[in-house]
Amino acid sequence: MSGHDSGNARRGRASFGAFVRKPVERGAAASTGAAAEQGSLEAAQDWPDDAVEVGAVVDAYGLKGWIKVAAHADAGRGGDALLSARRWWLERGAERLSVRILQSKTHGDTVVAQPAGVDDRDAALAMRGFRVFVRREDFPALAADEFYWVDLIGLEVVNEQSVSLGKVSGMIDNGVHSILRVEYPTVGKDGAPATDERLIPFVGVYVKTVDQAARRIVVDWEADY
């Protein structure tokens, strides 16, 4: 909503989730107020450049037009993006919509929300299968030593000897801590150019610094590990 990782990694643990399907309950709710009630589902003519996929509509919730969303992160992390954003961007096949969110809250392992213009259960059921996107600028602010996974993708990874280990191609949550997926160029058995991947735990014993401005992560990791 992804989710985010923290500078706590530098202290030996990662306290953030990521855009993976591991939601947990969080009881906060949000509302845009009466003015938002004038909104409705709209065709998305201009898709935001910073749109990040944070979930998917999986079902209706109740009888009054609420929808149920499986967040691609725990509800206290990437789910925060769903709860904080007052406008969601929806995509299903070639169909793209923009919707104002009147209310949202966690419900068990999901986030439930009331979109403007969706007034009954049938209309909510018709929204199943939409992927949900939120603008990156609408994500909740993090502490200085915390990072959203989406912001780590593409950063160069180097070790303390300044040897390049590749670039972050993705993240994994193994249930205990986060793991960097680092892709690097290599040569295949046939001599043709290829790519390979190394997995580096995002914990303090290995991750020394994360410099988003320089787009670089420094790790205690050898190239031949």
Swiss-Prot record:
- Where it mainly occurs, coarsely classed, is cytoplasm
Signal peptide feature range: none
Q: Which SUPFAM superfamilies match?
A: PRC-barrel domain, Translation proteins
Question: Which Gene Ontology BP terms does the record give?
Answer: ribosomal small subunit biogenesis; rRNA processing
Q: Which Gene3D superfamilies match?
A: PRC-barrel domain, RimM
Where in the cell does this protein reside? Cytoplasm
| Keyword Disulfide bond attributed | no
Question: A single GO CC term, please?
Answer: cytoplasm
Domain description: The PRC barrel domain binds ribosomal protein uS19.
Q: What does this protein do?
A: An accessory protein needed during the final step in the assembly of 30S ribosomal subunit, possibly for assembly of the head region. Essential for efficient processing of 16S rRNA. May be needed both before and after RbfA during the maturation of 16S rRNA. It has affinity for free ribosomal 30S subunits but not for 70S ribosomes.
The family this protein is said to belong to: Belongs to the RimM family.
Q: What is this protein called?
A: Ribosome maturation factor RimM
Q: From which organism does this entry originate?
A: Burkholderia vietnamiensis (strain G4 / LMG 22486)
